[in-house]
Curated annotation (Swiss-Prot):
<keyword id="KW-0808">Transferase</keyword>
<keyword id="KW-0949">S-adenosyl-L-methionine</keyword>
<dbReference type="InterPro" id="IPR023397">
    <property type="entry name" value="SAM-dep_MeTrfase_MraW_recog"/>
</dbReference>
<feature type="binding site">
    <location>
        <position position="82"/>
    </location>
    <ligand>
        <name>S-adenosyl-L-methionine</name>
    </ligand>
</feature>
<feature type="binding site">
    <location>
        <position position="103"/>
    </location>
    <ligand>
        <name>S-adenosyl-L-methionine</name>
    </ligand>
</feature>
<keyword id="KW-0698">rRNA processing</keyword>
<dbReference type="GO" id="GO:0071424">
    <property type="term" value="F:rRNA (cytosine-N4-)-methyltransferase activity"/>
</dbReference>
<dbReference type="InterPro" id="IPR002903">
    <property type="entry name" value="RsmH"/>
</dbReference>
<comment type="function">
    <text>Specifically methylates the N4 position of cytidine in position 1402 (C1402) of 16S rRNA.</text>
</comment>
<dbReference type="GO" id="GO:0005737">
    <property type="term" value="C:cytoplasm"/>
</dbReference>
<feature type="binding site">
    <location>
        <position position="110"/>
    </location>
    <ligand>
        <name>S-adenosyl-L-methionine</name>
    </ligand>
</feature>
<dbReference type="InterPro" id="IPR029063">
    <property type="entry name" value="SAM-dependent_MTases_sf"/>
</dbReference>
<keyword id="KW-0963">Cytoplasm</keyword>
<dbReference type="Pfam" id="PF01795">
    <property type="entry name" value="Methyltransf_5"/>
</dbReference>
<feature type="binding site">
    <location>
        <begin position="34"/>
        <end position="36"/>
    </location>
    <ligand>
        <name>S-adenosyl-L-methionine</name>
    </ligand>
</feature>
<protein>
    <recommendedName>
        <fullName>Ribosomal RNA small subunit methyltransferase H</fullName>
        <ecNumber>2.1.1.199</ecNumber>
    </recommendedName>
</protein>
<keyword id="KW-0489">Methyltransferase</keyword>
Amino acid sequence: MAEFNHVTVLLHEAVAGLAIQPAGVYVDATLGGGGHSGEILKQLTSGHLYSFDQDETAIHYNQANLGPAIEEGKLTLMQTNFRNLKQALADQGVTAIDGIVYDLGVSSPQFDDAKRGFSYQHDAPLDMRMNQDQPLSAYQVVNEWSYQELVRILYRYGEEKFAKQIARAIERARQKQPIQTTMELANIVKEAIPAAARRHGGHPAKKSFQAIRIAVNDELGALEDSLEQALALLKVGGRISVITFQSLEDRLVKTMFKEATSLPDLPPGLPVIPADAQPDFKLINKKPVLPTEDELKVNHRAHSAKLRVIERLK
């Protein structure tokens, strides 16, 4: 069994953001190593937690890790993508929830398990699937997607300004023979980026690997679907805590939360906004919560984390 030495980022802040009711119904949308689930379970008495993860490694690990809570009937593990949130909960007889937490991005064990192919630090087959049962892998994206599709995902999901050069280099390399491994891909990307640009900004393949991973797992599409369902499922007083690790995710969450907390178009000059026109949701923090200096010292992966929390008012 894979060992989850995953340090959960903003653990206490994210769970505190949910304002847990001991008898409430909660969801951990991203089970991973069970950090948030374990913290939520400590605060539940007669409540119940549904913890989602499409990665069977996380499910198997937590069947043992959180076994006592499962036996007590306080926890149900759900092996499915969180974009299936509404249907998966309905199958359990749940149509409303008191809170849900999202901890986005790849969990450390997925990065650290070389054979999963998420990292440019280890040589491994090109895979990057969070759900290992799905057919689409990084191998197909890199070897079969067109030049135009590669440029699109590198720009859109990697914010990579050398997207065209990288896509062209991938196209040239795969015409000779298929690109099989993460190291092959990392070297192709590195060579495609001008030498001057390689000297700063971290590993030259970082943005490309992020872009391909997001494309393989449709991460942004899944997040948008899931958040829409979560907003609809929330009871009055219920909250959503979302931890993001990169600007694309954070922008999506910020936009969706802004939309949910905005006033409708009203005639100008109204002295008082009628109660039924008030927004259904409010932001708990105007600005995102960031990790403390102490947390950054012990967890280098926390540096880009941001927490946003929203509450249903009516």
